[in-house]
């Protein structure tokens, strides 16, 4: 899959940033830190303008300025949730070695942005109407095995409710209701409070969501770049757009700082069309 993504990037001639998530960290396995460093070496070996941000398993933030118009602030949010080895403490070679140092650096990156529009990118969204947000449908309660294999339509009423209820109660650190995830959200909210970014862009959920944020103007969840790999989604009170469909999002920045979002849906024939558009500022 990574090779296919790189092929698209190389063909376009664009500069690409890969922001790590839980799967890049080998799904929280003890060897996750080694896995993310192997991926970094692979990207470097392919050339063509692909960069892992942040690198080395470091939490970030890494700041990339695009002239005087846009400031990109990249975070490795899995660093906060990783249960195995990670670069932290006095032995770490990362610029930020603790959670408090990360937050201080994020706060500084926002305050020093000047007139630039700030976009924060991190794999895990702060809010979501998807399964990681604890939102499950009736099918999850009746046919829970479909979360393992989509074709396992085996009804397990009552017993099947154990899985979605446990997820909604935060049994997994990859879910928003969990204690570890909540601590990360609260820390980032405190960093954003003084100078809220325009956009927090995330993946994690296999959905397309545009949500009006609290500590950030908009939360963009775009996680269906792999065709057919989609999950259900629930519209929240703050949702501006939500779809369970394959596609991606595009944000265009004008020289005067205005930003326009386009949500692109892709069909089985490979045709792409904008289904939702919004001026963000």
Briefly describe each language-model feature range.
Residues 204:
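Conserved active-site segments centered on acidic
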Residues 212-215, 239-281:
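A short C-terminal boundary segment appended to hydrolase-like catalytic domains
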Residues 1-118, 129-172, 193-199, 207-243, ...:
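Extended active-site neighborhood of metal-dependent phosphoesterases/phosphodiesterases
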Residues 123:
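Extracytoplasmic/periplasmic solute-binding protein
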Residues 176:
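Extracytoplasmic
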Residues 188-189:
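Active-site neighborhood of glycoside hydrolase catalytic domains
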Residues 181:
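The feature captures the conserved acid-bearing segment of alpha/beta-hydrolase catalytic domains
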